[in-house]
Amino acid sequence: PGSVDFRRYHKSGDVLMPLAPSLRRAAAGFLLLAAAAFAGPLIPPPATEAPLASRPGKETAVFAGGCFWGTQAVFQRVKGVLATSAGYSGGEAHTATYRQVVTETTGHAESVQVIYDPSLISYSKLLWVFFSVAHDPTQLNRQGPDVGTSYRSAIFYTNAEQERLAKAYIAQLDAQKAFPKRIVTEVTPLKAFYRAENYHQDYAYYNPDNPYIEVCDRPKIAALKRQFPELFVDYKPKK
């Protein structure tokens, strides 16, 4: 987040400033539109299902779907997810800071690293959640009010199986016309994931009344609970 209409960003000190009253009114009016956007029917599940592992373990997935606050808020409430981190992928290490990423010159996308137990949830189900409630995969280089390549839709795969499943699911959804427009999600190998600054971690949890969270992210969490009740779990950060 950084180029949004609902917040002001203090570029001199990486401080997120409170909203002006006029923006609060705009955010309140937009809330109904945001809620409606995630009230649609559940999209079809992946036809190609990755089987659950026979024993507990840890696997890594990395997704980019606009502002990482909301993407993290969704995946940390999915059963089988062990940990999440907000961060940056797609650019170089020396530009992996919020102040640089919001300039839209680094190649980074705001992304979320998802550590999950493959004996509890499959990569296919994570893809289903990602395309169903975490973001709109038909928006090119933006997500809602956030505009720029750092807000692009992307899947950073960590192995050939993740690449195969992601590409197959996108082809399936396009063929089934699951969305009004074609999916623009990039599927690209993960070169590196750089953890974002601490104040971005668990942001939606610690700032539930921030108008941006109310408008853009609460509807996603509500949609997850409504559309995937068997996967939804309450979340509380570990101390």
Predicted feature locations:
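Short, Lys/Arg-enriched N-terminal segments with co-localized hydrophobic residues
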Residues: P1-L16
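Flexible coil/turn and secondary-structure edge motifs
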Residues: P18-L19, L23, F38-K239
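Bacterial N-terminal signal peptides
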Residues: A26-A37
